[in-house]
């Protein structure tokens, strides 16, 4: 758990004073070796560069420490003044241990100011309200999470089912485009004419059968006439069947009359029919 931020202005001021009171020793005198050999010459050449690091850098270190101590004192002063100002401002509303403020602080018109009304609300009451609100929302959040988890597989399944449909539509569109470009595709099915009902376009089966039978009935008498002519070849006209009467006028029933020719005179119904019996 993180500790609350707290600044001790008194301790900060004491640390700044201790830092500013540090005393640094004086740098030693430069070292010089007398002699003429090569070792003496090397020492006299190397030592000044080493000593200069201390002698030249020590004043800068002292100045930096002094500046840091001064900044620490300034920060401690700022913290102290800010704490005092906040304490004075809060003391005007007389905050106590219970968190209640004075209700007697009023505005110029005699009505409590908005700040007084806000500050007069107990802190414990606000905390209680927040806790109750969080307790009411917790069950709803807990109940919503499982529903979202259950709906996730359905969403994935729907996306998978939609993929084949999209592929089918794409293939159909490509086939239609290829048929339009090639110009040699299957002819579309022709719909029934809107002017003629479907019942009239389709001829009933029994009507077709009757028409076929009627055609066969028309052809059959002609065949009978041809056979009769073949059998009666070489016979006398009186002995030939039909006696020159058209085949349509022949009848095997007793008392039947030959059909009248369109050019023949009308026959009286009361006149008896001539006999067509042939004597052998």
From Swiss-Prot:
This is ESX-1 secretion-associated protein EspJ. It is found in: Secreted. GO terms for cellular component: extracellular region. Could be involved in regulation of growth and intracellular survival. The keyword Phosphoprotein applies. It comes from Mycobacterium tuberculosis (strain ATCC 25618 / H37Rv). The modification Phosphoserine is found at residue 70. Residues 167-280 are annotated as: Disordered. The gene is espJ. Keywords: Phosphoprotein, Secreted, Virulence. Coiled coil: none annotated. Residues 76-280 interact with EsxB and an artificial EsxB-EsxA heterodimer. Residues 167-181, 246-280 have a biased composition (Low complexity). Phosphorylated at Ser-70. Its main location: secreted. Disruption phenotype: Inactivation does not abolish EsxA (ESAT-6) secretion, EsxA-specific immunogenicity and enhanced virulence. Deletion mutants multiply more efficiently compared to wild-type strains. Induction: Induced during stationary phase. Elicits a prominent immune response in human tuberculosis patients. Contains several epitopes, particularly in the C-terminal region. Transmembrane segments: none annotated.
């Amino acid at each position: 758990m993180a500790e609350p931020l707290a600044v001790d202005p008194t301790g900060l001021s004491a640390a700044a004073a201790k830092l500013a009171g540090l005393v640094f020793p004086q740098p030693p005198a430069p070292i010089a070796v007398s002699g003429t050999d090569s070792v003496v010459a090397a020492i006299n050449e190397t030592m000044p560069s080493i000593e200069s690091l201390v002698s030249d850098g020590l004043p800068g270190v002292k100045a930096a420490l002094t500046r840091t101590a001064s900044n620490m004192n300034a920060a401690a002063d700022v913290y102290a003044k800010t704490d005092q100002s906040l304490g004075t401002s809060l003391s005007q509303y007389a905050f106590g241990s219970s968190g209640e403020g004075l209700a007697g602080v009023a505005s110029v018109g005699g009505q409590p100011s908005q700040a007084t009304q806000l500050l007069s609300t107990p802190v414990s009451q606000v905390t209680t309200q927040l806790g109750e609100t969080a307790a009411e929302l917790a069950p709803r959040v807990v109940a919503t999470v499982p529903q979202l988890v259950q709906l996730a597989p359905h969403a994935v399944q729907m996306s998978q089912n939609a993929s084949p449909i999209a592929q089918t539509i794409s293939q159909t569109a490509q086939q239609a485009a290829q048929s339009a470009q090639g110009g040699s595709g299957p002819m579309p099915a022709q719909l029934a004419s809107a002017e003629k009902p479907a019942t009239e376009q389709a001829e009933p089966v029994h009507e077709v059968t009757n028409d076929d039978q009627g055609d066969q009935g028309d052809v059959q008498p002609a065949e009978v006439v041809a056979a009769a002519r073949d059998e009666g070849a070489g016979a006398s006209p009186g002995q030939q069947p039909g006696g020159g009467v058209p085949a349509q006028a022949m009848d095997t029933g007793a008392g039947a009359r030959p059909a009248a020719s369109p050019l023949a005179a009308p026959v009286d119904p009361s006149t008896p029919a001539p006999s067509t019996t042939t004597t052998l």
